[in-house]
């Protein structure tokens, strides 16, 4: 019985490269001269520090641009609240989302069931397995999910016939 898996994974090496490139740009840009701005990668999060709100927004724009150049979707980033640091500085934690949560998995399964295609979807840990009798139905599910915005970046792997 043909099947495939739906996952949400991020290449941490690409994120590390994008963070390093963004940090280089921030250190060299004229509008950041004389101010303390930084980007740090910590395990499953990125910590952004800006001299003020304007500078923090500019740091975020630089980071998003570098991620886009490295083909990493900004949907994998979960921006936390801005919190004050020392003086006028502002800090923000950005969590890196990996895997499909139970709620998102249920939402994906519901979308697939509402499509009336003859396939079954089941949640397995941090991924969703879709199986059906025809490969054409599975390809229709892939097209359906690519057209929908579920809030996270989806990859389709392990297509078996």
Swiss-Prot record:
Report the InterPro entries cross-referenced here: DUF520, UPF0234-like_C, UPF0234_N, YajQ-like_sf
| MF (Gene Ontology) | nucleotide binding
Q: What is the lineage of its organism?
A: Bacteria, Pseudomonadati, Thermodesulfobacteriota, Desulfuromonadia, Desulfuromonadales
Could you list this entry's UniProt keywords, alphabetically sorted: Nucleotide-binding
Task: Give the record's GO CC terms.
Answer: cytosol
Q: Which SUPFAM superfamilies match?
A: YajQ-like
Q: Organism's domain of life?
A: Bacteria
Main role? Nucleotide-binding protein.
Q: Which family does it belong to?
A: Belongs to the YajQ family.
CDD domains in the record, alphabetically?
YajQ_like
Q: What is this protein called?
A: Nucleotide-binding protein Pcar_0033
Q: Which organism is it from?
A: Syntrophotalea carbinolica (strain DSM 2380 / NBRC 103641 / GraBd1)
